Amino acid sequence: MPRHCSAAGCCTRDTRETRNRGISFHRLPKKDNPRRGLWLANCQRLDPSGQGLWDPTSEYIYFCSKHFEENCFELVGISGYHRLKEGAVPTIFESFSKLRRTAKTKGHGYPPGLPDVSRLRRCRKRCSERQGPTTPFSPPPRADIICFPVEEASAPATLPASPAVRLDPGLNSPFSDLLGPLGAQADEAGCSTQPSPEQHPSPLEPQPASPSAYMLRLPPPAGAYIQNEHSYQVGSALLWKRRAEAALDALDKTQRQLQACKRREQRLRLRLTKLQQERAREKRAQADARQTLKDHVQDFAMQLSSSMA
């Protein structure tokens, strides 16, 4: 299991990406070290009962380098390695109330980009109730509140034709200043836009073939609908099958090359043995010839000495 930061609200894990970003992890001092209390006090993390400070029993508690100031590290050697100083204490932590408020907002907030239907209906009802001649002024709506459905907002050209958008001139609405220029622009666009023969060709004219007709239709890869959320995801089974087949083919080819190299080595060994045997025979023949010559010289010397005597 990879190391992770134990600070409240910190989700940093010891991965290749974090190491490339220069984030390091440092273990919590042991219980006999006086700096342990400072680390836990600055962490502001409560125990499971919520009464006192957090005092873990595990020896594998780490804090990432994002909770330390820059002056807490020192440069070691020429490799650029940053080491934590002996008396360093983590001081950069988010307050507990801020973390709770963030978690509450994330838990009860609406996801961005997806409007709530009931919220839109209530907003439209409030907008319709506020419309009237006695209303002096209505503040503009907030940017995060959408008072119109998505269908009407996505097609502004159809707003002038909608009966819900047409308002009486005597009524005041917080959206009248927005709908007026929008409706005028839509009317001008509708009047200026006229069908042309270039935009609507006759069906009798021959159309050129689409390039997509000549393209190869490839099926989607296996598991394409699965979202890749982790770096250790399995991936496409077809791709892994092709890789396995390629690896098996490469293994078969390597084995054939190995067998051929072994046969070549055996032939070279046999040839070397024959050459060594021929060399040994030549050496023995030369030794025999020298011995024979030596014997002949000795016999000739003996005959010569006997004849002179």
UniProtKB/Swiss-Prot annotation:
<dbReference type="GO" id="GO:0016607">
    <property type="term" value="C:nuclear speck"/>
</dbReference>
<comment type="subunit">
    <text>Forms homodimers. Interacts with HDAC3 and nuclear hormone receptor corepressors. Interacts via HBM with HCFC1.</text>
</comment>
<keyword id="KW-0805">Transcription regulation</keyword>
<dbReference type="Pfam" id="PF05485">
    <property type="entry name" value="THAP"/>
</dbReference>
<keyword id="KW-0539">Nucleus</keyword>
<dbReference type="GO" id="GO:0001222">
    <property type="term" value="F:transcription corepressor binding"/>
</dbReference>
<feature type="compositionally biased region" description="Pro residues">
    <location>
        <begin position="198"/>
        <end position="209"/>
    </location>
</feature>
<feature type="region of interest" description="Disordered">
    <location>
        <begin position="176"/>
        <end position="210"/>
    </location>
</feature>
<keyword id="KW-0479">Metal-binding</keyword>
<keyword id="KW-0597">Phosphoprotein</keyword>
<protein>
    <recommendedName>
        <fullName>THAP domain-containing protein 7</fullName>
    </recommendedName>
</protein>
<dbReference type="GO" id="GO:0003677">
    <property type="term" value="F:DNA binding"/>
</dbReference>
<dbReference type="GO" id="GO:0070742">
    <property type="term" value="F:C2H2 zinc finger domain binding"/>
</dbReference>
<feature type="modified residue" description="Phosphoserine">
    <location>
        <position position="162"/>
    </location>
</feature>
<dbReference type="GO" id="GO:0008270">
    <property type="term" value="F:zinc ion binding"/>
</dbReference>
<feature type="zinc finger region" description="THAP-type">
    <location>
        <begin position="1"/>
        <end position="93"/>
    </location>
</feature>
<dbReference type="GO" id="GO:0031965">
    <property type="term" value="C:nuclear membrane"/>
</dbReference>
<dbReference type="GO" id="GO:0042802">
    <property type="term" value="F:identical protein binding"/>
</dbReference>
<keyword id="KW-0863">Zinc-finger</keyword>
<dbReference type="GO" id="GO:0000785">
    <property type="term" value="C:chromatin"/>
</dbReference>
<feature type="short sequence motif" description="HCFC1-binding motif (HBM)">
    <location>
        <begin position="229"/>
        <end position="232"/>
    </location>
</feature>
<dbReference type="GO" id="GO:0042826">
    <property type="term" value="F:histone deacetylase binding"/>
</dbReference>
<dbReference type="GO" id="GO:0000122">
    <property type="term" value="P:negative regulation of transcription by RNA polymerase II"/>
</dbReference>
<keyword id="KW-0238">DNA-binding</keyword>
<dbReference type="GO" id="GO:0140296">
    <property type="term" value="F:general transcription initiation factor binding"/>
</dbReference>
<feature type="modified residue" description="Phosphoserine">
    <location>
        <position position="210"/>
    </location>
</feature>
<comment type="function">
    <text>Chromatin-associated, histone tail-binding protein that represses transcription via recruitment of HDAC3 and nuclear hormone receptor corepressors.</text>
</comment>
<keyword id="KW-0862">Zinc</keyword>
<dbReference type="GO" id="GO:0140008">
    <property type="term" value="F:histone H4 reader activity"/>
</dbReference>
<dbReference type="InterPro" id="IPR006612">
    <property type="entry name" value="THAP_Znf"/>
</dbReference>
<dbReference type="InterPro" id="IPR026519">
    <property type="entry name" value="THAP7"/>
</dbReference>
<keyword id="KW-0158">Chromosome</keyword>
<keyword id="KW-0804">Transcription</keyword>
